[in-house]
Amino acid sequence: MRRRTFLRSSSVALPAAALGLTTARSAHADVRPTGSIAYPFSTIQVPTSSAPWTLEVHRAALLVHDMQHYFVKAYAPQDDPIGTVLKNIKSLLDTAHTHQMPVYYSAQPGGMTKEQRGLFGQLYGPGMPDDDTERAIVDPLAPTAADTVLTKWKYSEFFRSDLLEILHDANRDQLILVGVYAFSGITATSTDAVQNDIQAFIVADAVADYTSTGHNQALAWCAERTARILTTRSALGALNNS
């Protein structure tokens, strides 16, 4: 596993939180209580995408977004959405490794000072602690020696990272997005992708949000503006047959 500028206390790492929550007068936690999030995938709709892009294995890279214990522990572990999300991300990881696709992970370092947190401290509190358990990518999604872990600085993984450069170096112009949270970091990263001429693909049943409403809103917003929305089944089919 290769780490790219994965810093513990000397970079600005900002939490994933719902976009647009800017009216609170005092900070609230950037994660929900442990085990509190559950909603069925039967409530999730896969919208029609404006983007005409076709996923191709020789052009694509996979980004596993913020699947750290600190964020994932908010989900009821035996229920959807996280039960299905973990299974589907693992299937996509296995396929990516089989085809020798680049695999990247975004991971926040934790232990931010007040200055490093900046305005996010006012909105969401201190964020992830400086704790290896909280930082860890959850099983069974742990990075392999061939994968690259990137420091997560703000909502978008493109912000203050070399993700765009390493995509260019790998001759990849497509990015598959999976993980949490759908209506914050996933949405922001897909926005930066399209603004940098990287075709974004969001896998609808391999991402999750705080609520089914937020999940659906994220998919609908991105389908219209930034990304092609796929299911795990359609993504695997495209990768295995291109």
Which residue ranges define each predicted feature?
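A short glycine-rich beta-strand->turn/loop micro-motif centered on a GG-aromatic cluster
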Residues: 176-179, 197-212
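Internal catalytic-core helix/loop-beta-alpha segment
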Residues: 138-178
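Glycine-centered short loops/turns at secondary-structure junctions
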Residues: 100-101, 171, 197
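A charged, well-structured terminal subsegment
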Residues: 228-242
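Short glycine/serine/threonine-rich phosphate/pyrophosphate-binding segments
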Residues: 183-189
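C-terminal segment of N-terminal export signals and the immediately downstream linker at the start
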Residues: 1, 21-38
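Active-site acidic carboxylates
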Residues: 30-144, 239-241
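N-terminal export signals
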Residues: 5-26
